[in-house]
A protein has these predicted regions:
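Repeated loop/turn-to-beta-strand initiation elements of outer-membrane beta-barrel proteins
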Residues: 16-20, 117-122, 208-211, 266-270, ...
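C-terminal beta-signal and adjacent terminal beta-strands/loops
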Residues: 130-132, 221-224, 273-284, 307-365
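Residues on the lipid-exposed face of transmembrane beta-strands in outer-membrane beta-barrel proteins
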Residues: 8-12, 22, 108-112, 198-202, ...
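Transmembrane beta-strands of outer-membrane beta-barrel pores
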Residues: 24-30, 37-39, 104-106, 114, ...
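Gram-negative outer-membrane beta-barrel transporters
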Residues: 121, 125-284
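A surface-exposed, glycine/aromatic-enriched loop/edge motif typical of exported proteins
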Residues: 26-76, 122, 128-168
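Residues that define the transmembrane beta-barrel architecture of outer-membrane proteins
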Residues: 2-4, 92, 102-106, 192-196, ...
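Structural signature of Gram-negative outer-membrane beta-barrels, strongest in the C-terminal barrel
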Residues: 1-61, 66-67, 91-107, 111-117, ...
């Protein structure tokens, strides 16, 4: 098919030190080869809830019918269990019927370079991004909600697409016979985010050394994902400041990186400060977890680097990463997706290695 994209933007400088800028874009992205043709694979992901587990289906005829429609044998009703490891089978894979995803984005911001402060420059930009027909997989929570919430029915495709172990009725077991939850890619997703980026840089000569200060910060106002954009009942899930199996990587409300560098004749000393705002477990699922697992406090990391310019063509760099040996907060193994919460500590966001050292050499010819 044919897709059209376009972009419009402009800038205005009311005074020499200030530039105001803005832009609007209509963009598209076609699915890649993997998204189209990846072979379906059944594996494991974290989740420790199953509406069909326990005695509930024995007293609820509709729930019993749903469990049976998902492939549970009649003899398993009342004895279905949740995996003791807190995991379920999930089937992921490509989709040859995927179409292009489409986004409308707009930004407005300013560039400030004051004549009264040589060496100082600042930019601030508000961004607003809405992605429709997003190439995404539903979250595990969304798959369960589509079936078991809002007048569930044993004939609802959202229910029958969940496939249980044909011997036990569980959602875990042999991957050859238990596809579990369908997480294949579709164009049903909708993603929205907005926030502010702030960048500031300052350079000056202190006499005994050169000083460079750099700052990059982000404030995220909203980061929402809707698994089915065409279903008014589909949850428009907010993930800013939250973590759970239903949110991807942790998105703090505020984060920044600040670097201070002192440059001497042949040595550069640099201290980098990384800040990650505090986050908490998604309110919709908070009660399922221990109190101590429901929050991760704000984190400050410091990295120290020294560059020795031995000659014009040879330099040595020594670094200490995570200078104060900060340890990540342990939050349990099943509170987030295995893609991001491997090892109970969200190593995709937080430093799980502790203080470490490196020495590198660079030679130019």
């Amino acid at each position: 098919g044919t897709e059209y994209t376009w972009k419009a933007g402009g800038s205005w400088s009311p005074v020499p030190s200030l530039q105001i800028r803005g832009g609007y874009q209509r963009v598209t992205r076609a699915p890649n080869i993997s998204e189209l043709f990846a072979v379906p694979v059944t594996g494991l992901d974290n989740f420790d809830t199953d509406p069909c587990a326990g005695a509930a289906p024995t007293t609820d005829a509709n729930l019993r019918a749903i469990c049976l429609a998902q492939g549970a044998p009649a003899t398993s009703i009342g004895s279905i269990i949740v995996d003791p490891a807190g995991q379920v089978n999930v089937t992921t894979g490509g989709n040859p019927n995927l179409a292009a995803e489409k986004a409308n984005t707009w930004t407005i911001g300013a560039v400030f370079q004051p004549v009264f402060a040589p060496g100082l420059s600042m930019t601030i930009d508000y961004y607003n991004i809405k992605l429709n027909d997003a190439i995404t997989s539903p979250t595990i929570g969304d798959v369960f909600s589509a079936c078991f919430d809002n007048n569930p029915s044993p004939t609802n495709p959202a229910c029958t697409s969940i496939r249980r172990n044909p011997a036990t009725g569980n959602l875990f077991g042999n991957v050859g016979t238990t596809p579990g939850l369908p997480l294949v890619l579709t164009n049903q997703g909708q993603i929205f985010t907005d926030g502010i980026d702030l960048v500031a840089n300052y350079s000056t000569d202190l006499g005994f050394a050169g000083l460079d200060l750099g700052f990059f910060g982000n404030w995220t106002n909203r980061s929402r994902f809707k698994a089915n954009q065409d279903d008014p009942a589909s949850l428009n899930r907010e993930c800013v400041g939250y973590y759970s199996i239903n949110c991807a990587s942790i998105q703090p409300e505020f984060s920044f990186t600040q670097r201070t560098t002192l440059s001497f004749d042949q040595v550069d000393l640099s201290l980098r400060w990384r800040f990650i705002d505090a986050v908490e477990v998604e309110p919709l699922v908070a009660d399922a977890f221990l109190e101590d697992f429901r929050t991760i406090p704000s984190e400050h990391y410091f990295d120290l680097t020294a560059v020795f310019n031995v000659t014009d063509s040879f330099a040595l760099t020594a670094a200490v990463i995570n200078l104060f040996d900060n340890e990540p907060k342990v939050v349990g193994s099943n509170i987030g997706s295995t893609s991001y919460n491997s090892g109970n500590v969200f190593p995709s966001t937080y430093d799980a290695l502790g203080r470490r050292y490196s020495v590198t050499a660079r030679m130019t010819f």
